[in-house]
Amino acid sequence: MKILVTAFDPFGGEKINPALEAVKQLENTIGEHTISKLEIPTVFHESKDVIDKELANGNYDVVLSIGQAGGRYDLTPERVGINIDDARIPDNKGNQPIDVAIQEDGAPAYFSNLPVKTMTEAIKAAGVPASLSNTAGTFVCNHVLYQLGYLADKSYPGLLFGFIHVPFIPEQVTDKPEKPSMSIETIAKGLTAAIKAISKEDDAKVALGETH
């Protein structure tokens, strides 16, 4: 399949975004998939517009967005994006929507139609910590995951879409001793395993849920 992999520019005062740096390391062919890479701005709505423009020109089967989740220790494929922006910090253009619907005519939520459990298990099988996440937050990462579902629903029928959060890298936590980190190389290894696992097959039926 032809897969578009996107990653954000640095945000929140960080000088580097591990998602972007790891995506840069991905091979152009992973398994049976052809990979294209796209940097997107950490900006509400503009991020979606950049992806939409590329999708309109690219005839992609899949779009997989990668984002930073500082504080998480593992790679976390996301199950769902919700129709709300509630920004604790401004985006890279100073926008800070609070309790604003992303799309007035959109669904309350869009679930990733990728095999997220299979992908999570594949990351772990590659020796990289991973868990399935049921919340992508309410900042631009959730915004993009939701917008991907909206685009698939309204404009690109049959498009497969999803999102994976990645941890900080060591360079980002020299002044944050309480925060976990992971090397760019390990993040890229995990992303490669996840991408290899992408297919149109039914997802794995394994218990990866949370009790709270």
Swiss-Prot record:
Active-site annotation: 78, 141, 165
Q: Does the record carry Hydrolase as a key word?
A: yes
Its annotated compartments are: Cytoplasm
The UniProt record lists the EC number as: 3.4.19.3
Gene Ontology CC terms: cytosol
Q: Which reaction does it catalyse?
A: Release of an N-terminal pyroglutamyl group from a polypeptide, the second amino acid generally not being Pro
Q: What are the top taxonomic ranks of the organism? A: Bacteria, Bacillati, Bacillota, Bacilli, Bacillales
Main location (coarse class):
cytoplasm
Q: What is its quaternary makeup?
A: Homotetramer.
Q: Which family does it belong to?
A: Belongs to the peptidase C15 family.
UniProt protein name: Pyrrolidone-carboxylate peptidase
Q: Name one GO biological process term.
A: proteolysis
In terms of Pfam families, this protein maps to: Peptidase_C15 (PF01470)
Originating species: Staphylococcus haemolyticus (strain JCSC1435)
Q: What UniProt keywords apply to this chain's record, in alphabetical order? A: Cytoplasm, Hydrolase, Protease, Thiol protease
Entries under InterPro entries matching the protein: Peptidase_C15, Peptidase_C15-like, Peptidase_C15-like_sf, PGP-I_bact-type, PGPEP1_Cys_AS, PGPEP1_Glu_AS
What function is annotated for this protein?
Removes 5-oxoproline from various penultimate amino acid residues except L-proline.
